[in-house]
Amino acid sequence: MAILISDVFFTIGAVLIASSYSVPQMIVGRIILGIGVGGAAVIAPLFITETAPTAVRGRCIGVNAFFIPFGQVVADAIGAGVQNVHNGWRLLFALGVVPSVLQLLLFHYLPESPRILILKGDTDRARTVFQSIYPTATRDMIDYKFRVAQEYVAATTALQSETTFWERVKKVWKTGSYRRSITTVSVLQAAGQLCGFNTLLYYAGTLFGLLGLSNPALGGLIPAGTNAVFVLIGMSLVDKVGRRGLMLFGVPIMLLGLVWNIIGFYYLCKPTGGFLDTSYSYDTTNVGVVIGGIVFFVVGYGLTYSHLVWYQAEYLALEVRSMGSGVATTVCWIANLVVSVSYLSELETMTPSGTYGFYLGLSVIGFAFVVFCFPETKQLSIDETSLLFENDWGVKRSVQMRKERRETRKRFQDAELAEAATAHLEARQQKSTSVSPAELSKFMAGLKGNKRKPSVLVKTAT
């Protein structure tokens, strides 16, 4: 329902802006559109987190994150195309109605979160949703997942019914596990903004115009397009490499890109006293070096912060998931506002090299936080990840929990193999056919090497 409400705000905001004939109307439209963006930014990743299978949850959230830079690429391309068209900006904003209306029409076909259904007491539908999320799982595995979710919802419901909203707010900051989890996702959101990436999007036209590009409006396609490509690569790797693994690999690339920008801007701006001058024609080689540094920086950003910050719901307990996601997203937009407002002033006072040096310092602090305080959630269910922060920041506990999860999965698989072998023996006995140890070993090896369900294999064997 919350996503549908966001769609309504998207639609109204886009219509108001596209039909604006006064600045106040445009401002009102932007505010309404911003409310829709803020709501969707919180709810969409949370919904995906609760309805996606554990094995591909990262990729599912990544798809959502991918469409952010993809939308930016489309918007930049359309903006460049209508730059010289009379009232072309109206068309640009009017097109924003299309995805919101489309989602309004199609959202009816999506399932509700099973945890929300359990919360409402609709356990039959919740079990059905779990079966649709895990279509190849056995009944025992579905029962296990349902039982874990049911116990967790019961515990969190008891907490919410016994306390008021403000009592829960106080409890969040007094309870170490809640405080650490919300701090983790909030710091990650802040780091994703304070590295300066979004300044490349907001001021790409201005920046690339200063660098001498003939069509500055197309400049936004360079960072946005690179970001979209590497978000796609990152989301395809996230469930294999892991969230923490991608951060440890991708952020150093981003840091090297910032160093590249510092050096590139230093030599580029030497003839103009270290500052960018709109009236000066810069050396094309140096311009190319700077653009290369920007692209290299965006490669690292696309692999990491661009989509991993939206995995925030994974790290939050159910009872603080909405509140924590709201806090983290608010931190994101506040940091975004601070960087956006100060960027051009920083270029004029600190020089471009100094500005990117400042972003480098903030990014190093963010990376240090990732190294020591950002645990891995790969292979863990949404009901298990919130346990990571019970005693500390969960980096070591994550390793132990994932090891235990693999052992549990192996026990389930061994139980299925044993059941299949028993059924095979019984079927052969009914046919009065003896089974040699060698034949049984061969059958078991076939089960282990086949990814299909044992029940299917038994049918074919008999």
UniProtKB/Swiss-Prot annotation:
Localization in the cell: Cell membrane
Main location: membrane
Reactions it catalyzes: myo-inositol(out) + H(+)(out) = myo-inositol(in) + H(+)(in)
Stored InterPro entries: MFS_dom (IPR020846), MFS_sugar_transport-like (IPR005828), MFS_trans_sf (IPR036259), Myo-inositol_Transporter (IPR050814), Sugar/inositol_transpt (IPR003663), Sugar_transporter_CS (IPR005829)
Induction pattern: Induced during sexual reproduction. Expressed during infection.
Keyword set, alphabetical order: Cell membrane, Membrane, Transmembrane, Transmembrane helix, Transport
GO molecular function, one term: myo-inositol transmembrane transporter activity
Pfam families assigned: Sugar_tr
GO biological process per UniProt: myo-inositol import across plasma membrane
Annotated membrane topology: Multi-pass membrane protein
Presence of the UniProt keyword Transmembrane in the record: yes
Endoplasmic reticulum keyword on record: no
Any one annotated GO CC term: plasma membrane
Transmembrane region(s): 1-21, 31-51, 61-81, 91-111, 194-214, 218-238, 245-265, 289-309, 324-344, 354-374
Family per record: Belongs to the major facilitator superfamily. Sugar transporter (TC 2.A.1.1) family.
Function: Transporter for myo-inositol.
NCBIfam families named among the record's database cross-references: SP
Protein name: Myo-inositol transporter 3B
Gene name of the encoded protein: ITR3B
